[in-house]
Regions:
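Charged, gly/pro-rich active-site loop segments
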Residues: 1-10, 82-152
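Short, solvent-exposed cationic patches
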Residues: 2-7, 57-75, 112-116
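Short, basic/aromatic recognition patches
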Residues: 2-26
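Amphipathic alpha-helical interface surfaces
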Residues: 15, 57-60, 98-102
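A generic secondary-structure signal marking the coil-to-beta-strand transition
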Residues: 15, 23, 48, 82, ...
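Short secondary-structure boundary/capping segments
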Residues: 16-17, 42, 62, 120-122
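Short beta-strand segments
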Residues: 22-56, 62-64, 70-74, 83-86
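Short, surface-exposed beta-strand-loop junctions and turns on beta-sheet-rich folds
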Residues: 58-60, 79, 146-147
Length: 152
């Protein structure tokens, strides 16, 4: 079993299930005044990056430019809980249109009919593409992997 912190955990069945789920990610970042922020957000896993999208005027983009270190959690709320914890660096790219990964996320979250319909309402809208490169990965499944406080 891969150790907590290993990028190999991204291939674990728990990670794969959560990365393919319709659960929102929770993006944690540092605000301009140094305080922590957490926001729920749609995501798409490319196999290498967690990609988020945001309106180009979203305040979080300024904060990510100042400090690109982030944490992402994707979890479910059925016992036994499953949690994917990721730390990494966010790279923000401004686009003239909808991010391709946002289209994929919309289809996953809304379904094959409503997802493309939603994206079509956004066509031509500038969007920020936020690609997070994982540097640390952890999994909790409350069966074989527990929070570290329970194993001390």
């Amino acid at each position: 079993m891969a150790q907590q912190g290993s990028l190999e955990l991204l291939n674990d069945p728990v990670a794969k299930a959560l990365l393919g789920s319709v659960n929102p990610a929770r993006l944690a970042y540092t605000w301009m005044d140094g305080s922590p922020r957490v926001v729920p957000i749609w995501f798409h896993w490319t196999g290498e990056h967690i990609v988020l999208a945001s309106p180009v005027k979203a305040p979080k983009l300024r904060a990510l430019a100042a400090d690109p270190q982030v944490a992402v959690t994707i979890d479910d709320n059925a016992w036994p809980y499953k949690v994917l914890l990721i730390r990494g660096r966010a790279n923000v790219e401004m686009l003239d249109d909808v991010a391709p990964e946002y289209e994929l996320a919309a289809t996953r979250y809304f379904g094959p009919e409503q997802g493309p319909n939603w994206v079509n309402t956004l066509r031509g809208t500038p969007m920020a593409r936020i690609a997070i490169t994982p540097s640390w990965v952890g999994i909790l499944d409350f069966q074989t992997r527990f929070p570290s406080a329970l194993t001390l």
